[in-house]
Every structure is written in structure tokens, then in C-alpha cells.
Amino acid sequence: MGRKKASAPTTYESLPVTKTKNGYLYKQIKRTDKVAIYEQSVENENNGDVGRVVAYEVFLIVIAKAYSLVQKHGQKQGQIYNYPASEKFPGNEDFGKWAWTFHTKDAAMEKFNALK
């Protein structure tokens, strides 16, 4: 007997329109139900000229399941944190698998159009 494919949660949080990560501002410039494209610009002067666009990130829409974590140490030991199901913004380990970086908008749009 084969394994059942896990289905995506029926309700989940969407990707944010803007997101700050590692001193960069990410702005969603286009998306479908399958793929999104974000413009990456400098937000922290330690990374260069604030506002300068440095790259475009294209990635498949991946939905992470809801989960809970229990604080194991410190003053809040035993506290439970609940995280809802949500569309996942890629981490470093996801690039080359379901996320890609491009230095021009045209190249990013080409990948976006191939995936949508």
C-alpha cells in the first residue's frame, strides 16, 4: 500500500508584502498562487547605500505546517509558543532547491514566468 501525500493546511498566513531580514528590505513585486518575486534592497547602512536594490529573489510558494515550541531554558521555561501554518519565506538552505537569486529584474522575471 502506498503512502498518502500530505495535504496543505486549508487556512494559513500569506507571505508578507514587505519583510526585513539580515539588514535588507524585501518587497513583493509579483506573485501567483505558486510563485513569488521579491526585490531585495539595502535597509541597514552597514550593508551599503540604503535603498539600493541588490538582487531579486524568486521562489515557489511553500506552506509550512503549524507547530508549537516549548521554552526549555530561562525565565520563561515551560512557556508554549504556537506558530500558525504559513507560507514560508526561504532561508539560506532553500536556495537552489525552491528559491533563486538574480541580479537583474529581467532574469528574475524570466524565472518567475517559467515557474508560474
Residue ranges of each PLM-predicted region?
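A short, exposed loop/beta-hairpin motif centered on an aromatic-Gly-Thr core
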Residues: P90-E110
